[in-house]
Structure formats: C-alpha cells, structure tokens
C-alpha cells in the first residue's frame, strides 16, 4: 500500500492577504506527516505530527492561535482515532496545553477511557509529564482583537467565526492502517465550558480500516447533529467514493440543519478527497510523490514532491 495523507486548516472564508500563509501552513503540516509515512511510520503518528504543526502555526484556530471564549480565555478540544482497532482518545475544554493532540493520543494509549475533560484532563497531563504553558502564551494579537470586537454591543460572533475552522489530518500507511486527528480552539466568544464536535467521536473525526478515515471542520453544533464523520463513512460503506460520500454528507447537513463545513477523507484503497460547502478551506495532500494544495472550490495545484521539499 502506498501511503497517503491529507490535512486541512479549517473551512470558512479566508481573506486574500492571508492566502499564502494558509497555504504554507498546510504544506508544512502535510510534508511533516508524509515524512513519517515515507519512513514506514504509522498513520496514527503521521496524523498526530501533522496536526502538531498546525497547532503550532499561529494562523490556525488550534493550539497557539486558538480563539478566546467569552471570558477571554482559551479552551481547546482534540481527538485522534486509530482505524486498526477503533481506539480513540480525546480531550475537551483544556487549557495551558500547547499541543492538545498529544494529550488526546495519551488518553487513548495510557487510559481505559476515550475522553477526558477540563480539570481531569489537566491532572492527567501533569501525570504524563506534559508541560503546562501559560494560556496567555497561546493567545495571539489576532485572537485578542477578535474577542474584544465581539464584546461590543451589536457584534456578531457567528459571522466573525468565518475563516476560523478546526484543523485536522487523515492518513493511510504502508500497512493499510488509517487514522484521523482533529484539533480546535472552538467558537470565538463561546460560553465557558462549551465543547463542540471535535472531541466527539463520529463528529469531529472517525477512522476504520474497513472503510477509511474522515476529519471534519465547520459549525460544530451542526456537525454534531448529523454525526458528520461517521455519516460520510456510512455512505462509503454503501459503495460511494470519498468525493460522493463527502458531497452527500455535506449536502445533508446543509439541507437538514442549515450547517456548512468541510471534510477530508481517505478510504481503505488510498483514494482521497477534500470537500467543503463554505467559501474556502485550506488543505493539502500527498500521494504518489505528488503534493496537492488548494483553498478554493475546484482548485488542486499539483507539484512533484521532490520540487516541494
């Protein structure tokens, strides 16, 4: 099996002046993940490493750069799933952690549970030697300005959420194992304690070697209502291609609950897609030594991998 990896930097509306920054970010992430796969590493490690890159990039709403809740603080969610045995680990409403996806994997591998939240997740992180960082160190000037703007009367936090999507990755390795990983800072100016789709298995992501892997982005409550990631895999189980399944899932979410978003998918044969119902979604993929990058509908810029390194 030839390895494949796809990453996304969130669905929404990307302003033109940040176009190149988003492209550079997803490119770095997908190349990091593919480097793991090309050396015989697992899909699980590949998606984790790719998402760590995205969490460290200030432009994305995950890790460093996460949006602020109504109190001006950061609370983050993340999930990772292994398609080989359906094991999954997730964390929600966590603070003071630079890379939530690392903690999510530890939940999967070091506990009998699948999701730890808030204080419990913090205690677990300490026990595992994950260093705490001041939440303020994760706050960017961009996030702070957006938070302050939405404190004003007649503000519209929902509209201001545009371009602040979740980040994620899906991959299949040389042994045919698939995995997904998703991480987010959530909704800007959200209520304290709000947890969205990302940390919820089947919504923020799902991976099953028998079918494939999905990572989602978009309006979290809408994604949760239709259990988007698992819904898409169900369509694939019924014989749809990744592209057909993505369209079916996104169209259903829009028609049924009025939600928009985006998905990245890889199936058990290594076929992949990146689809979205928002204006834009930054994404990148590597397959057959070809780097693919896009932001706009119908865009797929292809570069030989040797020229992209």
UniProtKB/Swiss-Prot annotation:
**GO annotation terms (biological process):** asparagine catabolic process via L-aspartate; proteolysis
Which keywords appear in this protein's UniProt record, sorted alphabetically?
A: Autocatalytic cleavage, Cytoplasm, Hydrolase, Protease
> Is Transport one of the keywords UniProt gives this record?
no
* Binding-site positions, substrate: 194-197, 217-220
What GO terms fall under cellular component here? cytoplasm; photoreceptor inner segment
Active-site annotation: 166
Keyword Repeat among UniProt keywords: no
Q: Which reaction does it catalyse?
A: L-asparagine + H2O = L-aspartate + NH4(+); Cleavage of a beta-linked Asp residue from the N-terminus of a polypeptide
Known SUPFAM superfamilies for this protein?
N-terminal nucleophile aminohydrolases (Ntn hydrolases) (SSF56235)
Q: What is the E.C. number?
A: 3.4.19.5, 3.5.1.1
Provide the record's note on post-translational modification: Cleaved into an alpha and beta chain by autocatalysis; this activates the enzyme. The N-terminal residue of the beta subunit is responsible for the nucleophile hydrolase activity.
Q: Where in the cell is it found?
A: Cytoplasm
Pfam families for the chain: Asparaginase_2
Please name the InterPro entries in this protein's record: ASRGL1_meta, Ntn_hydrolases_N, Peptidase_T2
Subcellular location, principal: cytoplasm
**UniProt-recorded Gene Ontology molecular function terms:** asparaginase activity; beta-aspartyl-peptidase activity
- Gene3D superfamilies, A to Z: (Glycosyl)asparaginase (3.60.20.30)
Domain of life, per the record? Answer: Eukaryota
In which family does this protein belong, per the annotation?
A: Belongs to the Ntn-hydrolase family.
**Function, in words:** Has both L-asparaginase and beta-aspartyl peptidase activity. Does not have aspartylglucosaminidase activity and is inactive toward GlcNAc-L-Asn. Likewise, has no activity toward glutamine.
> Which PANTHER family does the protein's record reference?
ISOASPARTYL PEPTIDASE_L-ASPARAGINASE, L-ASPARAGINASE
Subunit-structure text? Heterodimer of an alpha and beta chain produced by autocleavage.
Q: What is this protein called?
A: Isoaspartyl peptidase/L-asparaginase
Q: Which organism is it from?
A: Xenopus laevis
Gene that encodes the chain: asrgl1
């Amino acid at each position: 099996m030839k390895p494949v990896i796809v990453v996304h930097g969130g669905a929404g509306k990307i302003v033109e002046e940040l176009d190149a920054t988003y492209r550079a970010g997803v490119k770095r992430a997908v190349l990091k993940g593919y480097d793991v796969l090309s050396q015989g590493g697992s899909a699980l490690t590949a998606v984790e490493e790719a998402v760590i890159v995205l969490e460290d990039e200030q432009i994305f709403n995950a890790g460093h750069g996460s949006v602020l809740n109504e109190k001006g603080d950061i609370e983050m969610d993340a999930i990772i799933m292994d398609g080989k045995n359906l094991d999954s680990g997730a964390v929600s409403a966590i603070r003071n952690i630079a890379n939530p996806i690392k903690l999510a994997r530890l939940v999967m591998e070091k506990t009998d549970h699948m999701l730890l939240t808030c204080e419990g997740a913090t205690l677990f992180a300490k026990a595992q030697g994950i260093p705490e960082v001041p939440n303020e160190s994760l706050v960017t000037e961009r996030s702070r300005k957006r938070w302050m703007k939405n404190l004003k009367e007649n503000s519209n936090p929902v509209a201001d959420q545009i371009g602040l999507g979740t980040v994620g990755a899906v991959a299949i390795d040389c042994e045919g194992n698939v995995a997904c990983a998703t991480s987010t800072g959530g909704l800007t100016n959200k209520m304290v304690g709000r947890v969205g789709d990302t940390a919820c298995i089947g919504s923020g992501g799902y991976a099953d070697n028998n079918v494939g892997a999905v990572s989602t982005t978009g309006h979290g409550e809408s994604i949760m209502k239709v259990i988007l990631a698992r819904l898409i895999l169900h369509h694939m189980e019924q014989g749809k291609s990744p592209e057909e399944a993505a369209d079916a899932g996104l169209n259903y979410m829009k028609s049924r609950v009025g939600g928009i978003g985006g998905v990245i998918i890889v199936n058990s044969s290594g076929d992949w897609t990146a689809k979205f119902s928002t204006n834009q979604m930054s994404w990148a993929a590597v397959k057959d030594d070809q780097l693919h990058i896009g932001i706009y509908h119908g865009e797929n810029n292809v570069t030989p991998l040797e020229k992209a390194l």
